C-alpha cells in the first residue's frame, strides 16, 4: 500500500478544516497509509528584512527536511511549480507506483515559502493554481485531490 506523508508548517486552528481533513483521511484509509506532520512555524513579525526572511525559511526548512528519508519521493507545493489536471495528477501518482516509489511526501511550506534546501530536495514542484491559498486550507485541498486521484486510478465514480 502506498505511504503518503504530508509535512506542513504551522498548526490548523479552524475546526471546519480539521473536520474536513479528518473526513478525507478516513476516506483515504482504503487506498493509502497516511501520515500528517505539523512543523512549528517560526515567529514572523509583519516586516522582516530579506535576511530575516531567509533565516525563518532556513529554520522551518530544517524542520521540514528532518523527517524525510532519502528514498521518499518529495513533492513540494509551490506557486512556481507545474500545474496538473486531476486526471494528470492521478496518472502521475500511478507512474510513481510503477517506478517503485512506495513512499511519497508532500511538503507545504510556511507563509514566507521554503528554503533553497527544501526546493533542492523536492523531486517535483506542484502548483495548485497561480492563486494564493491559506496554508491550512491547502492541506484539505491536497487530501481531496489525493482522494480524487485514487478514485480516478481505480476507475471508481467520483471525478466529475
From Swiss-Prot:
Keywords for this protein: Cytoplasm, Methyltransferase, rRNA processing, S-adenosyl-L-methionine, Transferase
E.C. code: 2.1.1.177
GO molecular function, one term: rRNA (pseudouridine-N3-)-methyltransferase activity
Classification via InterPro entries: Alpha/beta_knot_MTases (IPR029028), RlmH-like (IPR003742), tRNA_m1G_MTases_N (IPR029026)
Family indicated by similarity: Belongs to the RNA methyltransferase RlmH family.
Quaternary structure annotation from Swiss-Prot or TrEMBL: Homodimer.
Protein name: Ribosomal RNA large subunit methyltransferase H
Species assigned in the record: Desulfitobacterium hafniense (strain DSM 10664 / DCB-2)
Amino acid at each position: 500500500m502506498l505511504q503518503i506523508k504530508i509535512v506542513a508548517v504551522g498548526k490548523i486552528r479552524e475546526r471546519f478544516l480539521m473536520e474536513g481533513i479528518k473526513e478525507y483521511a478516513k476516506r483515504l484509509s482504503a487506498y493509502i497509509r497516511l501520515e500528517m506532520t505539523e512543523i512549528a512555524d517560526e515567529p514572523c513579525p509583519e516586516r522582516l528584512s530579506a535576511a530575516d526572511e531567509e533565516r525563518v525559511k532556513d529554520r522551518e526548512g530544517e524542520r521540514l527536511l528532518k523527517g524525510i528519508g532519502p528514498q521518499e519521493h518529495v513533492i513540494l507545493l509551490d506557486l512556481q511549480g507545474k500545474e496538473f489536471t486531476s486526471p494528470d495528477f492521478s496518472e502521475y501518482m500511478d507512474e510513481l507506483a510503477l517506478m517503485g516509489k512506495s513512499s511519497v511526501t508532500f511538503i507545504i511550506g510556511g507563509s514566507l515559502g521554503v528554503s533553497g534546501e527544501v526546493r533542492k530536495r523536492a523531486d517535483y514542484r506542484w502548483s495548485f493554481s497561480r492563486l494564493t491559498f491559506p496554508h491550512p486550507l491547502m492541506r484539505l485541498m491536497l487530501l481531496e485531490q489525493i482522494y480524487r486521484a485514487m478514485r480516478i486510478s481505480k476507475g471508481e465514480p467520483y471525478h466529475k
